[in-house]
Amino acid sequence: MKDNYHHGDLRNALIEAGIKIINESGEDALSLRKVAAACGVSHAAPYAHFPDKESLLSAIKETVTNDFLSELEKAANGSKVKNAQDAIMTMGERYILFFRNNPDYFNFLFHKQKPEVHTDMSKDYPNDYAPFLMFKRYLNKYFEESGIKLSAKEKEIGLIKTWGLVQGLSSIAGMENVNATISWKVLAKECLK
């Protein structure tokens, strides 16, 4: 049988294959047999990691979310970050580059899984998507640090404008047919100024 994965990392190979299948053919097309075939392993091999399709889907969502959140945390805690504004800028850049480097993740998360978010800046919601909640908290911190008095409505609009810019740039960055002459690292930094 053809070996399409790195030995010892079948679980992650199955997750990546699952994301590709979902993005190409939809969630209904996902099966443990199909991810096994995509990885070039026996049909029984995925069962060592996932008892059923639902557990694979759950692992896909968890993996993508954790990878994304980890990137944002690294950005927010970077050595050049001195305040909330710096954190937001570096998180925004990392957000865009993460999805530029992982376009299948963007489609999976925002078009297939549809994570829950609340744009009310006055409180956290327990079901909010963790990376979004982190972004929202830093934006709230920025509003506090800036000393600018904003109404709840103005804060919510600020969140939507900021998130919309980053989300839109991430969507464009992940498109195969977009051929920018400037690197996305530079574009992300310049567009977020």
Where are these regions (language model features)?
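Helix-turn-helix
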Residues: 13, 17, 21-55, 59
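Hydrophobic alpha-helical connector segments
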Residues: 73-104, 149, 158, 162
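N-terminal intrinsically disordered/low-complexity leader segments
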Residues: 1-9, 20
